[in-house]
Amino acid sequence: MLNSSRKYACRSLFRQANVSIKGLFYNGGAYRRGFSTGCCLRSDNKESPSARQPLDRLQLGDEINEPEPIRTRFFQFSRWKATIALLLLSGGTYAYLSRKRRLLETEKEADANRAYGSVALGGPFNLTDFNGKPFTEENLKGKFSILYFGFSHCPDICPEELDRLTYWISELDDKDHIKIQPLFISCDPARDTPDVLKEYLSDFHPAIIGLTGTYDQVKSVCKKYKVYFSTPRDVKPNQDYLVDHSIFFYLIDPEGQFIDALGRNYDEQSGLEKIREQIQAYVPKEERERRSKKWYSFIFN
């Protein structure tokens, strides 16, 4: 009876303290009973995350941060370098192929113009330059030439076109180191003598050569290049009359053949790019004939 009373008293005491008997003897429990203080203390011994991990995943001993293998770092370094190199190579290849494609298209255009020009534009002519020397179609060979037809009494159009021609000559010479022969052929032989042309052209680029001739000579060369010619035949130098003519620049290759014409739709910059492209795409006649005999000649046709 006495033992039962003691058990009951102990249970009542523990129930009031809200502590299990097992908790008194288990250090990892939630609560620890302090008999001397009469209060409950919360334990700071928290369960570590590693205690819940499987044994095969627990870290044994001190944790060691091993350095990344040199081979791995090398391959990572090489990978991004190879990527950059591939991008640069792709960009360079695209730019090169684009430029080659443009040159090939320009070359085909020039070949088509030559085929047309050999029948319709150009041919033999005899004129006199502003130094009094003869000038024929043979003087067109060996260099690129630009022909322009005008007259010294032109009030506005011819000076504007000669200014544009001056710009092209200067840019090609200074930036591309390309020498081109600029020719100014007069459509007014009665008034444009060699001395008059020399004085008139002195206001423009010094490389421009003035050409003139007799009425029949000038009319003949205008006809060969399909230039509109309206100058009356029997006129006096002091007589006032109108001269009308076509407004084109004719680009001639070193073989003396027509390859392109530039009208007023070309400004200074676009005309310069057009001339530059034609010169860069130029292929000598011997090379064109050699290509035409190869099995891959269809590429250039």
UniProtKB/Swiss-Prot annotation:
Family to which this protein belongs: Belongs to the SCO1/2 family.
TM annotation in the entry: 82-98
InterPro entries: SCO1/SenC (IPR003782), Synth_of_cyt-c-oxidase_Sco1/2 (IPR017276), Thioredoxin-like_sf (IPR036249), Thioredoxin_domain (IPR013766)
CDD domains per the UniProt record, alphabetical: SCO (cd02968)
Major subcellular location class: mitochondrion
Extra remark: Present with 1480 molecules/cell in log phase SD medium.
Cell compartments where the protein resides: Mitochondrion inner membrane
Keyword terms: Chaperone, Copper, Membrane, Metal-binding, Mitochondrion, Mitochondrion inner membrane, Transit peptide, Transmembrane, Transmembrane helix
GO cellular component, one term: mitochondrion
GO molecular function: copper chaperone activity; copper ion binding
Function: Acts as a copper chaperone, transporting copper to the Cu(A) site on the cytochrome c oxidase subunit II (COX2).
Gene Ontology BP annotations: cell redox homeostasis; cellular response to oxidative stress; intracellular copper ion homeostasis; mitochondrial cytochrome c oxidase assembly
Residue ranges of every copy of the Thioredoxin domain listed in the record: 101-284
SUPFAM superfamilies xref list: Thioredoxin-like
Keyword Mitochondrion: yes
Gene name of the encoded protein: SCO2
Superkingdom: Eukaryota
Protein's name according to its UniProt entry: Protein SCO2, mitochondrial
Organism field: Saccharomyces cerevisiae (strain ATCC 204508 / S288c) (Baker's yeast)
Residues holding Cu cation: 154, 158, 245
Gene3D superfamilies linked to this entry: Glutaredoxin (3.40.30.10)
